[in-house]
A protein has these predicted regions:
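Transmembrane-helix signature of polytopic, membrane-embedded enzymes
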Residues: 9-14, 104-130, 148-149, 181, ...
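Transmembrane-helix motifs of polytopic, lipid-linked glycan transferases
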Residues: 91-115, 153, 157, 416-419
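Extracytosolic helix-loop segments that constitute the early lumenal/periplasmic catalytic or substrate-binding loops
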Residues: 23-24, 38-63, 70-73, 295
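Membrane-interface anchor segments at the N-terminal boundary of transmembrane helices
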Residues: 8, 87-91, 333-334, 344-346, ...
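Membrane-proximal stem/loop segments at transmembrane-domain junctions that anchor or position
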Residues: 262-383
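Short hydrophobic alpha-helices at membrane interfaces in multi-pass membrane enzymes
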Residues: 119-125, 157-197, 228-232
């Protein structure tokens, strides 16, 4: 078998296996009524059939800006062919995710040395195709599959620049010449920024990728002689990000009379109160994913039981009793108004003043671990529990085995990525992928109140590209032979 046929065979087999796994998830474990899924479906259908990007408020179809329009546009495109079918949307996501597998493999190959790119590409496509975590999200009507694709494409494009094994794009003297923007429309910085801009219309935090790129370039080009290159790259990426957002911002200005390039931080309607005091309180202790279900996702809709709150959320019995009284007050009305929210905020302030490192360091670090190492079974009929091992094994062995399998697979991907990062530490592009994973993780650990494991799935294109590097093997060829391979 020729190397080319071997490559094609591996691609075909990997994509076939990946398609089978994703289709199984979509047909066996579809999720249409969880989280924002019903909201996205309604937004897309109203936009497609009634020409209004909105949903009923007090019985009246009302234009809103609560979600950026990228994913509803994707759903509307699917619905225009298949009707209001969540299953059709999932199958479209299966196809899109298989394309993402190829993009990730290309990214992995670009990071590898020339002589190993074929092997690393094959490893990358298999690792991406068989990844159950990204694959499982094709079975839910949420943004993850689309934004992972756009993130992978953006990274691949940006790796064509100085961020990866690309070319130097500008001499310092060009800053004062007409050539400063020569070739801008085809420049990897501009094109990568454009892809990130479209990704921002799917998930508003996608520009974290541009911030990561900027940090890498800032460290590399901190000397005055390199400032021209730094300024040019920053301008091109910034303009690229903004251009796709302009139509959305214009729509919000003309329809809602509001300056909004993204979406409201807490997806609130105009005049709707956001209980930030409650969030301040949970930020002093909440780091486990299970506690999100029991607290944050119940606010203003369900009762919150003091018995569901872990003991480490209280510094004393008196504080626990105080919080019990506050929660009783909430449970009577199932609404957190400004007065009640102030009580949560006061408890949060007191807890932070007593233990500032807990709020600002310990909890974010624990959330980091939760983001990366919580069993990624949230879309499956599995409890996600491993402890106590003996009890879980005896009570529900299949559930335990599913959770254990997903935990081990997640650990294998992370360990392979760490090994790949070490092997690639002197190659162009290594630092960009690492910084992106770190920046995105720290952002969600510190500034987002719910440590959901899905928030780091956008790191998986970078993670899998790194995880493929150990499969490069070693070359016995001479340096000259490597260059011609």
């Amino acid at each position: 078998m020729t190397p080319q046929n071997k490559l094609r065979g591996n691609i075909a087999l990997a994509l076939l296996a990946g398609c089978a796994m994703r289709t199984y998830f979509a047909l066996k474990f579809p999720v249409t009524d969880s989280g924002d899924a019903p909201f996205y479906i309604e937004l897309a259908w109203n936009w497609l059939k009634k020409g209004v990007y909105g949903f009923p408020v007090n019985g009246v179809l009302t234009a809103v800006d609560m979600r950026v329009p990228g994913y509803p546009a994707f759903l509307a495109a699917v619905f225009s062919f298949a009707g209001q079918s969540a299953r059709a949307a999932m199958l479209a996501q299966v196809a899109l995710d298989l394309v993402t597998c190829i993009v990730i493999a290309l990214l992995a190959a670009r990071l590898a040395p020339d002589w190993a790119r074929r092997r690393v590409f094959i490893a990358g496509v298999w690792l991406a195709a068989l990844c159950p975590f990204t694959g499982n999200y094709t079975a839910v009507v949420l943004t993850e599959t689309l934004v992972i694709f756009l993130t992978a494409v953006a990274i691949l494009v940006l790796m064509q620049s100085d961020l990866g094994p690309g070319r130097s794009v500008l001499r310092e003297a060009d800053l004062t010449r007409a050539g400063f923007l020569r070739g801008a429309l085809s420049d990897p910085y501009f094109l990568g920024g454009m892809v990130v801009g479209f990704g921002t219309l799917v998930r508003p935090e996608t520009p974290l990728l541009i911030i990561s790129a900027g940090l890498v370039l800032l460290v590399r080009w901190w000397r005055p002689r390199d400032w021209a290159k730094l300024i040019r790259a920053g301008v091109l990426m910034g303009v690229g990000v903004l251009l796709p957002l302009v139509p959305w911002a214009a729509r919000n200005w003309f329809v809602l009379h509001d300056v909004q390039f993204l979406a409201p931080r807490y997806s609130e309607l105009p005049g709707e109160y956001t209980p930030l005091g409650f969030t301040d309180w949970t930020n002093t202790w909440l780091w486990r994913y299970r506690d999100v279900y029991l607290t944050q996702w119940k606010v203003n809709s369900e009762e919150i039981s003091i018995d569901d709150i872990p003991a480490y959320a209280f510094d004393s019995d008196a504080e626990r009793q105080r919080m019990s009284d506050i929660l009783d007050e909430y449970n009577d009305v199932l609404t957190i108004d400004p007065a009640l929210d102030a009580k949560f905020r006061e408890v949060a302030r007191e807890r932070t003043s007593r233990h500032p490192l807990r709020t600002y360091v310990a909890v974010p670090l624990k959330r980091t671990l939760a983001l990366w190492f919580t069993p990624r079974t949230e879309l499956l009929p599995s409890s996600g529990k491993l402890w106590p091992v003996r009890s879980e094994w005896e009570d529900d062995r299949p559930d335990f085995l599913v959770t254990l399998s997903f935990t081990l697979i997640n650990g294998i991907y992370v360990l392979l990525a760490l090994a790949g990062a070490w092997l690639a530490r002197r190659r162009p592009g290594w630092s960009f992928l690492i910084v992106f994973c770190v920046v995105r993780t720290l952002f969600f650990a510190k500034f987002v109140e719910t440590p959901e494991p899905r928030y780091v799935l956008e790191c998986f294109p970078a993670l899998i590209a790194l995880a493929a590097q150990p499969f490069a093997g070693r070359s016995n060829q001479s340096p000259a032979a490597r260059r011609t391979n």
